[in-house]
C-alpha cells in the first residue's frame, strides 16, 4: 500500500437509461469479448468468444457476495455514476490500462457504448480460440493418447 487511503466507491449503473443497480466496490470493469480474457477474467468475469458482440460489466472486489458479472448486448448504452466517493479517494477511468482520466467535481458520470470505428484482429490461420484458452488457462489434460 502507498500512503493514500483506498476506500470503496459506490456506483450507480444504468443500461439504456434503465436503472440496473447500485454497488460498492473498488472499481468497475467494462470489457468487450476481446477484453473478457484479460482484467475482467482476473476479477471473476466470464470468457466471451471473440465473435460475440457484447459487453461484460464486472465489479472489482465488490462489498456484496451476490455481485455477479453482467453480459449485455454491444449496442447498449451504459452509464455509470459515482454516487459516493470518499473525499480522500481518487477516482479514475482507465482505458485499456493506458489512458487515465480523473473523475473530479461534476464529472461523476461516464458513458460507455460501442464505437462506430472497427478494427480486425489478425491471427495465424491455424489459431484456435479454445486451444489458446486451454493452453493459457490450463483447462484440461491433453487428449493425446486417448
Where do the PLM segments sit?
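Catalytic phosphate-donor-binding core of small-molecule kinases
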Residues: 1-28, 37-146
Amino acid at each position: 500500500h502507498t500512503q493514500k487511503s483506498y476506500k470503496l466507491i459506490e456506483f450507480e449503473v444504468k443500461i439504456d437509461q434503465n436503472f440496473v443497480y447500485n454497488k460498492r466496490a473498488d472499481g468497475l470493469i467494462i470489457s468487450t469479448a476481446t477484453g473478457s480474457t484479460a482484467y475482467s477474467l482476473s476479477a471473476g468475469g466470464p470468457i466471451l468468444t471473440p465473435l460475440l458482440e457484447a459487453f461484460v460489466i464486472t465489479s472489482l472486489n465488490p462489498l456484496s457476495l451476490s455481485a455477479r458479472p453482467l453480459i449485455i448486448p454491444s449496442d447498449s448504452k451504459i452509464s455509470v455514476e459515482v454516487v459516493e466517493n470518499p473525499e480522500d479517494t481518487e477516482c479514475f477511468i482507465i482505458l485499456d490500462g493506458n489512458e487515465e482520466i480523473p473523475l473530479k467535481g461534476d464529472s461523476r458520470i461516464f458513458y460507455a457504448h460501442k464505437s462506430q470505428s472497427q478494427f480486425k484482429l489478425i491471427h495465424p490461420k491455424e489459431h484456435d480460440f479454445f486451444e489458446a484458452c486451454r493452453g493459457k488457462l490450463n483447462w484440461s489434460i491433453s487428449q493425446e493418447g486417448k
